[in-house]
Structures are given as C-alpha cells and as structure tokens.
C-alpha cells in the first residue's frame, strides 16, 4: 500500500508572532518554523526529520505558505498560495499530489510539532496499511497529530477551512481508529514553548 507522509508548514504563526513581540528574552525575531533549536536545526527541520525517519519508503510531501522553508532532503516541497484561507487548502495541495502519485492514504502532521517521534509516524502508517479509514494519534488519551486519511475519505474533507480532518472525524466517528503514540505532540505557539523545547 502506497502511503504518503505529509508535513503542513504553511501557516503564518500569528500567536507566536504576538508572543515574540511581547517577549524580552532576546529570541531572534523569525517565523516559528525557522526558529533554531539547541542543535542548530530549525523547528520544521526537526519535524521533518521525524517524519522522514518514520515513513518507510513512501513519498514525503511538505507544504509551505507564509514563509520559504529550507530545502528538506528527499521531499517534494509544494507552495500553497492560498494558505491564508485555512489549513484545508494546504491539505488539499498535498492530496492533489498524492492522487497523482497513486497513493492510497496520507499521514499528515504539522511543521510546528518538533517533538513527535518517528515511531508515531510509523504507527499511523501501519494503521493505514492495515485498513484504517481515519487514523488519529493519541497521547495519554488525547487525539492529536499525526492523522492518517485513506483515499476513501478524501472526498469528505473540507476545501477551505482551518479544521483539516477534524470535522470529518466528528461527522463520521465510526471511521476513526485511535493509535496510541509515545512522543510529544506539543506545538510551538509562543516564545515560552520555544524555550521549553530548547530544554527538552
């Protein structure tokens, strides 16, 4: 089964920018996806590395929007000019490519979640291979990312909202398979989040 791994990294980082403007910590004023960790790699590079390590031999797709991303090895990098219209536009940018690549499912994560583990990506990929319609990672019982979407549910996805797959999961709970994961799904939404990530 051909499963594409997708990293959505197109948002404007509005909450982080507000936090950055208010901070007095000397943190460089850059987009959160480009903020650098203790090892010199950016937030999005960490998120991508985990995805790549946990994705087997499937295609790697990265969708950018508000900011130009660094080159990411072995990835097809797409720009979504409609990124400001909501996360679903970025998801559809990736799915359009997945259709052309004859993929039967996608596993989708976010570029501002650098602590998701490679094993979490693998677990979602395995769930899709075993026939899940929608797979969702859970951390201590909470549904978070990554999320797996079989080709059969793609027509149900919204085209221009910020909900991604959440509305489909609410409308079709019987299609959802929860996949327990062990990483950390916290995102970087503030300077405090960034500094905490530096310490983790």
Residue ranges of each PLM-predicted region?
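Short, polar loop motifs at secondary-structure junctions
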Residues: 63-69, 173
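SAM-dependent methyltransferases
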Residues: 1-6, 16-17, 53, 74, ...
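Short beta-strand segments
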Residues: 8-10, 63, 109-111, 137-140, ...
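Residues at secondary-structure transition points
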Residues: 25-38, 42, 78-89, 115, ...
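N-terminal glycine-rich phosphate-binding loop and ensuing alpha1 helix
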Residues: 1-64
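Conserved beta-loop-beta/alpha segment of the NTase-like Rossmann-fold superfamily
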Residues: 76, 84-151, 155-157
